[in-house]
Amino acid sequence: MLEFKKFTDFPRGMMYEILADAYSYDERNKAVWDDNWHESDDFFYDNPEIAEKYGLVTCLDGYPIGFVTWDPRQRPEYVEIGHNAIREAYKRQGYGHMQLAEAISRIKKYEGLKRIIVCTNSKLIAPKNYESVGFVLYDRKANNTDSAYNGEYLYYEISLE
C-alpha cells in the first residue's frame, strides 16, 4: 500500500540514503552532490517543525521509497520544489508521479499562492515527471557547473492565477 508519511517518522540519514540511491545510476552525482545531500538531511532533521510541514516521504508497504520537499518562503509569489527523489528500484513505476501529485495537492492549499516552480536538468527523467503533473517549461539556461553532464537547467512552473 502506498502512503505518505512525515520525515520525523524516520531516522536521520533516510533523506541522504534515498538521494544517494536515486542518483546512483551515475557515480559523478555522488561526487558532485554528496555534501548537499548531507546538508539537506541535517537541515530537515535539525528542524523537525519544518520537515513536518514542507515535505513528505513516500512509503510502499511501510518502506520509504522516495520523498519530496518544498520551500514556501517566497509565498504568495511562489513555492519552490526542492529535492524530489525516488529510489532507483522504484523508478518508472508511477511512484514519482504520485509523490509529486501529492505534494502539488498540498502546496495548492496555500491561500493566494501564484505559482509553483522547480528547476531540473534536461538529461534527467524528471522533466517528464514534472510535465505529467502540469508543470510548463518557461526558461532554460546553460549548465556550466560540475553537474553539466546532467544537461542544461530547465525551469518549470504551474501558474495558479
Q: Can you describe what each PLM-predicted range is?
A:
Residues 3, 9, 20-45:
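Conserved GNAT-fold acetyl-CoA-binding loop/helix
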Residues 107-120:
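Conserved GNAT acetyl-CoA-binding A-motif
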Residues 1-13, 17, 159-161:
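Conserved N-terminal entry element of GNAT/NAT acetyltransferase domains
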Residues 131-140:
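Conserved acetyl-CoA-binding loop of GNAT-fold acetyltransferases
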Residues 117-127, 143-149:
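Conserved beta-strand-loop-alpha-helix junction that forms the acyl-donor binding cleft
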Residues 45-52:
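Short loop/turn motifs at secondary-structure junctions and domain boundaries
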Residues 86, 92-105, 131-132:
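Conserved acetyl-CoA-binding loop-helix of GNAT-fold acetyltransferases
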Residues 57, 63-72, 78-80, 85:
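Conserved beta-strand in the GNAT
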